[in-house]
Amino acid sequence: MGMTIIEKILARKAGVAEVHAGEIVTVEVDMTVLIDLQFATMWMQPLMINDASKVAIVMDHAVPAPTIKDAAGGPNARKFANDYGIERFYDVGRHGICHQVIAENGLARPGEILACTDSHTCAGGAFNTAARGLGPAEVYSILCTGQTWFQASPTIRYELIGSMPAGVSGKDVFLYIADAFGDATNSNLEYGGPGLASIPLNDRRTIATQGAEISADFSTFAYDDVLAEHFDDLGITSYEPAHADPDAAYAAVREIDLSALAPYVARPGTVSRNGVSVDEVEPRKIDQAFIGSCANGQLDDLRIAAEILRGRRVAPGVRLIVTPASQQVYRDAMRLGYLQDIADAGAVITNSTCGACFGYHMGVVGPGEVCLTSSTRNFTGRMGSTEAEIYMASPATVAASAVAGHITDARKVVAQWLQVSL
């Protein structure tokens, strides 16, 4: 019996011929990523680490530190990096949301295993990587031993056909999947098929990242020319992609016709079986619009927002907050003029941080407020008050809605303006 992508990676890293659903294996971990929150809460420096070249540290969730407790974590992180000679240390100023930093620096590579304490680590699956969020205790163990264990879960295959229409993004693809099929608890997600070639890497990253919202174990994409070009651009050639066997056993194979999709919105509470076409929630008034996070704070997301906002103004009574996914994205967007267009429209642009996404700082919503976000989660209380409502949509939908003052279809709004390449 053949193997899926994840089964292939687990087998290779366990040093065995085959792995199939239900089996437990101990595997070598290629990269372990630590984030700032670990160093601010109950940090105890290990007495040894297995391999400093396989460790990275990223300051991301609480940057700049909004509390004394968070500020105290910084010295812990710097001491740890210095004591063990960890060169991949992305301190404040070089930082970004860890999954963006992982992408920019090629830390998630085809056919490899990456672990991190952040729940959205499945974002690395866009690179044909077995990327998984784990608890702090397990990550400590990996630091010391270089290994961890996994039980291989059944895999759901999404066979993509067609191509996304104008105005439809990876966010819409995910929201459709989450609504149509619901949770994927104790399952892996695998994306492939002829339609994959039409999905840009930034949209693949959005889809992979959001796998956490439907409780997937791994959320992994097939290796193709898009990934080959990406790693060539980074100057990285040392990797071995994993390809699913033709006779791989899947729990389900679901065909998604990308050309049939439209902009989607997840209603407050959850993304699972809770999405609708944007027309069904228009014209819900909003108080805050947010563009950012590891899922949708990438350079292309800011380009789309800038093109929609250029020459226009955010509606009275609406605050638009934009958070680039990394300081590198921030600098690139500044050089390209995107941030100028966004700021001129009346938006607030923050430094790179996870702050607003998890309701910590730089965009917390209050009681009775309605927020439309392109971030990762919309459960009650996620971005602040438990009495707030959080709708989730693509950056295009968020930007257009910020101008309209209510949730709206960006395609309709843009059609009334000059042409914008969504």
From Swiss-Prot:
Its EC number is 4.2.1.33. Pathway: Amino-acid biosynthesis; L-leucine biosynthesis; L-leucine from 3-methyl-2-oxobutanoate: step 2/4. It catalyses: (2R,3S)-3-isopropylmalate = (2S)-2-isopropylmalate. GO terms for molecular function: 3-isopropylmalate dehydratase activity; 4 iron, 4 sulfur cluster binding; metal ion binding. Binds 1 [4Fe-4S] cluster per subunit. InterPro entries: Acnase/IPM_dHydase_lsu_aba_1/3, Acoase/IPM_deHydtase_lsu_aba, Aconitase_4Fe-4S_dom, HAcnase/IPMdehydase_lsu_prok, Homoacnase/IPMdehydase_lsu, IPM_dehydratase_rel_enz. The keyword 4Fe-4S applies. It comes from the Bacteria. Keywords: 4Fe-4S, Amino-acid biosynthesis, Branched-chain amino acid biosynthesis, Iron, Iron-sulfur, Leucine biosynthesis, Lyase, Metal-binding. HAMAP family: LeuC_type2 (MF_01027). Catalyzes the isomerization between 2-isopropylmalate and 3-isopropylmalate, via the formation of 2-isopropylmaleate. This is 3-isopropylmalate dehydratase large subunit.
